[in-house]
A protein has these predicted regions:
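A nucleotide- and high-energy phosphate-metabolite-utilizing enzyme signature
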Residues: 1-322
Length: 322
């Protein structure tokens, strides 16, 4: 049906049912996956849905005269945690559609078709639409946008547009480096004040949470264009430190995924009433002692991430402290 001139809403209806079946089986997938591995699997599944929608939309637009992908001036780009392949189950899917307004291609209509189908599937989509030439100016309007752009990843579409996008991102990465770092450090301080390490920690925004780990990556990306933290230079990070940090982070990935699965929604605060359910899904004994062991490991892991991220951020930013 998807390739036989079906209406967009019919396509979305079929995809919506497939997505529901997929989400219903996530706990089984989680049980046999590691922390980051589960996030990568989920990310790849979302990638496959977006690629499918792109394929359907382009075939519908061009029919028997479908050009090569590289000839259609549009790329679908993942941003944020989706770009890092760390997309949690109920987190928003941050998508950017980058295009060039080339005469002869009705790219804007194609973009609308893609978005309408995706909206109708029920996916929690956050999207941006920009021409390649807009990216630099857009990045200067909001530090959140700049941050998202420097951790972007191509999903589908024209590799030519993606190459131009990468060139724009390289320019963005080198622009106002000191101001970017100062703003991110200030942002971190504010988040730590708002979400201190308590008995109900915020795994994303709080002390020792994913934002601390992300900040190491963002600053490392700005300075060294690394693809992950472990690729930072040896004078900043050593293998033993990284291994300890990574074990803690891997555990927190599993905790956050379990928290989303148990809550059946986006939830980053490990509330006391949820601890028994999250602990159980992670294999801890369903008893007060088991719950306490789990809560202690969460706290210890957050402290580990906080410790090493602080050391590395201090080294990476020592020239920018005022």
């Amino acid at each position: 049906m998807l390739y036989n001139n079906a209406a967009d809403f019919e396509i979305a209806k079929v995809l919506k049912q497939d997505i529901k079946i997929y989400f219903d089986t996530l706990e089984e997938t989680f049980a046999t996956s590691g922390g980051k591995d589960f996030l990568v699997k989920h990310t790849k599944k979302i990638d496959s849905i977006l690629k499918h929608v792109y394929k359907v939309a382009t075939r519908d637009m061009f029919g028997d005269y479908l050009p090569m992908k590289n000839s259609i001036p549009l790329s679908l780009v993942a941003l944020g945690s989706y770009g890092r392949e760390q997309l949690c189950v109920h987190s928003d899917i941050d998508l950017m559609l980058v295009y060039k307004d080339v005469p002869g291609y009705n790219v804007k209509e194609l973009i609308e078709k893609i978005l309408y189908i995706l909206w109708d599937t029920g996916l929690k989509l956050g999207h941006r639409v920009h021409t390649v030439d807009e990216l630099f100016d857009v990045s200067k309007t909001d530090i959140t946008i700049k941050t998202a752009l420097i951790e972007s990843r191509m999903i589908e579409g024209s590799s030519f547009i993606w190459m131009e996008t990468q060139n724009a991102i390289s320019q963005i990465r080198h622009d106002d480096v000191e101001e970017f770092i100062q703003q991110k450090l200030q942002e971190q301080e504010e988040k730590h004040r708002k979400y201190p390490l308590t008995m109900e920690p915020n795994l994303k925004e709080g002390v020792g949470g994913f934002r601390d780990a992300n900040l190491v990556f963002w600053i490392g990306k700005i300075h060294f264009n690394v693809e992950n933290i472990k690729n930072l230079p040896a004078h900043i990070i050593n293998e033993k430190e990284y291994k300890t940090f990574r074990i803690a982070l891997e555990f927190l990935f599993r905790v956050r995924s379990a928290l989303h699965l148990v809550s059946k929604k986006k939830e980053d605060k490990l509330r006391l009433d949820l601890i028994p359910y999250v602990a159980t899904i992670l294999g801890y004994e369903n008893s007060k002692k088991g719950h306490m062991r789990f809560a202690k490991k969460v706290t210890d892991s957050l402290k580990t991430v906080r410790l090493y991220s602080t050391i590395w951020i201090e080294t990476l930013t020592r020239d920018y402290h005022k």
